[in-house]
Amino acid sequence: MNANPISQTSVSVNIQQVMKRYETREGQEILALDRTDINVNPGEFIAVVGPSGCGKSTLLSLVAGLAKVSAGRIAIDGEEIRRAHPKTGVVFQSDLLLYWRTVLDNILLPIEIKKRDRAAFVPKAEQLLEAVGLKGFGAKYPAELSGGMRQRVAICRALIQTPGLLLMDEPFGALDALTREQMIMDLQSLWLSVKNTVIFITHGIEEAVFLADRVLVMSPRPGRIDLDLTIDLPRPRTWEMHRDPKFIEYMQTVRRIFEAKGVLHQ
């Protein structure tokens, strides 16, 4: 991705004593999240890492306004969330592109849904495509793109409305190792040019430490925040930083939490 000064207004996120319960078809109650507290400052990149089933995606759905809390409060810029927030964009693990629409049409879909002036957003869509290295691909269809390229389009779609908050739910989980490595570098580059607030869900400790300003470690279900780790590493971060003793120590700190919980074993 090329550096691109796309103007964004970042937001704060305040999560207070949030709990989420589900009821199974058999009537059994499952506590997915338990008394979760998180404060995210405007422009911060937060990575949330934890084992499968710990409530990471549930947390993201609550912040996105796609589900309601069972208890507690979530606010964006001080405004309590009761539905999908207009300042929020979401990127899922699957790109969810519509195969019958071109790349440009997929990016502009949120604009059409909100009945805004499509033509006014075409230049921004093209600017985003150039920022993610897909200049000239606007007329292509999803089937003509690789998995990494489709995920770049999904990121453009999330950014087209200039969201102050970008929520990413394991966006690189379905990609091969080499593509994932490139996407991690590309995301860092784009975020440094945009500087909006990001909450990034991942299973990968390495990925979390490399990308984030802070890494939040969640316990096995019911999910709680076991560790809030500030990552004090210079930016932009290069791949060679994986060999930095400080980077390795951050990774070991997170691993020790999982080992203590029985998630990882020596």
Residue spans of the language-model regions?
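Helix-to-loop junction immediately C-terminal to a conserved catalytic motif
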Residues: A64
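Conserved signature/switch motifs of ABC ATPase nucleotide-binding domains
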Residues: K140-A143, Q161
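A short, flexible loop at the N-terminus of ABC-type nucleotide-binding domains that lies
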Residues: Q8-S12, R21-R35
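The feature captures the beta-strand-to-loop junction immediately N-terminal to the Walker
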Residues: V49-P51
